[in-house]
């Protein structure tokens, strides 16, 4: 499910107030404000009826994602996985999910854990142990943020791992540092 920031758009009673808010957000987005770009992605991707526009949502998410905005990267990855507003592409989806995970997004970390776990149980994939350790790390990080289902997935995964693999997964999780989003970096 595409996630959102609860209070990004405040509901107002009049349509003119909403249009005014939209114009202000669009002006900021056009100037490169990643928060506003993400907000427009949310607006178009979660709208009802004729206002729903996955192509516009993906376009605005991409603008914010290119500025290392983890939630936009995650939502764009989900859109590529589903083929919403963009061609369905599992490899591109996984790339955006990885960027979101590396940026500290718990949803991205959980979903990357799922992708790594799937690779670890695929008998045709080389590097099953490496994928299992990576899945462990990502589930661990998502669980530490309280992301739904991650703690259970992390615990289930440990049943299939050796002590050495678990120790390595813990070492990697402890060493993880989320990259700072580009739009927040001081140049």
Segments the model singles out, each with a brief description of its role:
Residues 13-24, 51-60, 87-96, 123-137, ...:
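Structural signature of tandem alpha-helical TPR/SEL1-like repeats
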Residues 2-12, 148-187:
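Terminal, low-structured helical/coil segments at or just beyond the last alpha-helical repeat
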Residues 28-29, 36, 41, 57, ...:
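Small-residue (primarily alanine) positions within well-ordered alpha-helices
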Residues 30-33, 46-48, 53, 66-70, ...:
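Short helix-capping/linker turns of helical repeat alpha-solenoids
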Residues 43, 64, 79, 100, ...:
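TPR/TPR-like alpha-solenoid repeats
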Residues 2-44:
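N-terminal segments that cap or nucleate solenoid repeat domains
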Residues 39-46, 73-82, 86, 111-123, ...:
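Hydrophobic face of amphipathic alpha-helices that form TPR/SEL1-like repeat modules
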């Amino acid at each position: 499910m595409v996630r959102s920031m609860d209070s990004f758009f405040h509901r107002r009673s009049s349509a003119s107030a909403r249009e005014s808010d939209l114009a202000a957000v669009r002006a900021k987005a056009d100037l490169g404000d990643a928060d506003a770009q993400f907000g427009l992605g949310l607006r178009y991707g979660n709208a009802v009826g004729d206002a729903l526009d996955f192509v516009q949502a993906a376009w605005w998410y991409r603008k914010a994602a290119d500025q290392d905005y983890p939630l936009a990267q995650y939502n764009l990855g989900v859109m590529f996985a589903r083929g919403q507003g963009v061609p369905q592409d599992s490899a591109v989806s996984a790339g955006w999910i990885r960027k979101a995970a590396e940026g500290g997004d718990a949803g991205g970390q959980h979903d990357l854990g799922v992708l790594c776990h799937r690779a670890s149980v695929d008998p045709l994939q080389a590097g099953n142990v490496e994928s299992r350790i990576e899945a462990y790390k990502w589930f661990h990080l998502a669980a530490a943020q309280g992301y739904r289902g991650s703690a259970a997935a992390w615990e289930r995964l440990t049943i299939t791992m050796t002590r050495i693999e678990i120790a390595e997964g813990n070492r990697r999780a402890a060493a993880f540092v989320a990259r700072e989003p580009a739009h927040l970096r001081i140049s």
